[in-house]
Curated annotation (Swiss-Prot):
GO cellular component, one term: bacterial-type flagellum basal body, distal rod, L ring
Covalently attached lipid (S-diacylglycerol cysteine), positions: 16
Name of the protein described by the UniProt record: Flagellar L-ring protein
Biological processes annotated in GO: bacterial-type flagellum-dependent cell motility
Family to which this protein belongs: Belongs to the FlgH family.
Protein's gene: flgH
Cell location: Cell outer membrane; Bacterial flagellum basal body
Lineage: Bacteria, Pseudomonadati, Thermodesulfobacteriota, Desulfuromonadia, Desulfuromonadales
Organism expressing this protein natively: Syntrophotalea carbinolica (strain DSM 2380 / NBRC 103641 / GraBd1) (Pelobacter carbinolicus)
Keywords recorded for this protein, A-Z: Bacterial flagellum, Cell outer membrane, Lipoprotein, Membrane, Palmitate, Signal
Length: 227
């Protein structure tokens, strides 16, 4: 009977806790390019207009809606090590040998008291701690992004993404950031190391991704377990 009485309370606690567990969400889908109505250039009678390509300029992304290929090559490694050692020791002893002859009276009050050895203490502690951490990440991919905004200084805001599905497992790559037109090569390719405020997300969704995390009950118990 006690078990049935406690069960509703546990279910209420689980319900409260599960609402607080927030799973990390990947970056949102790329923002669609703004529909900008291009100005109608005046034709001064020439065969070439500003709306067409130039004979003296590479065919690179430079306007809203243009696409650019991003070569993603991210490599990062970090390590940290720390150690601490402390120690302290102290000792103290005190006794009463002669004090106007009253040291004998102290011994007469209690036969277990020795006036010559009243206090004798010692203290010692030691601490030794160490820790180390290391991390290494590599990401190599190619992604086509779209210019979604042109800043007043000429820099371009880009965003893009792609999804590859293999055996019902989705591999998702999302990217957004700011690039300079000068960093775009003649083949209309820009390296990810030249992207300002780059946000690159490489996530997965499917059976394999679900198996890489504990079950929901395990996560709940790990969250509320006080020991």
């Amino acid at each position: 009977m006690r078990t049935w009485a406690v069960l509703p309370i546990l279910l209420m606690l689980v319900g409260c806790v599960t609402q607080r567990i927030v799973e990390p969400q990947p970056h949102s889908a790329p923002i669609a390019a703004r529909q900008v109505q291009p100005e109608q250039p005046q034709a001064p009678g020439s065969l070439w207009t500003e709306g067409r390509g130039s004979l003296f300029r590479d065919n690179k992304a430079r306007r809203v809606g243009d696409i650019v290929t991003v070569a993603i090559y991210e490599q990062a490694s970090a390590s940290k090590q720390a150690s601490t050692a402390t120690g302290r020791s102290s000792s103290m002893s005190a006794g009463l040998t002669n004090l106007f002859g009253i040291e004998g009276n102290i011994g007469n009050l209690n036969k277990f008291i020795d006036p010559t050895s009243l206090i004798d203490t010692s203290y010692e502690n030691a601490f030794d701690g160490s820790g180390s951490t290391s991390r290494k990440e590599d990401l190599v991919a190619t992604l086509t992004a779209q210019v979604i905004e042109e800043l007043p200084n000429g820099n371009l805001c880009i965003a893009g993404g792609k999804t590859v599905t293999v055996n019902r497992e989705d591999q998702i790559i999302l990217l957004e950031g700011i690039i300079r037109p000068e960093d775009i090569s003649a083949r209309n390719v820009v390296s990810s190391k030249h992207i300002l405020d780059a946000k690159i997300a490489y996530t997965g969704k499917g059976v394999i991704s679900d198996k890489q995390r504990p079950g929901w009950m395990t996560r709940v118990l790990d969250h509320i377990w006080p020991f």
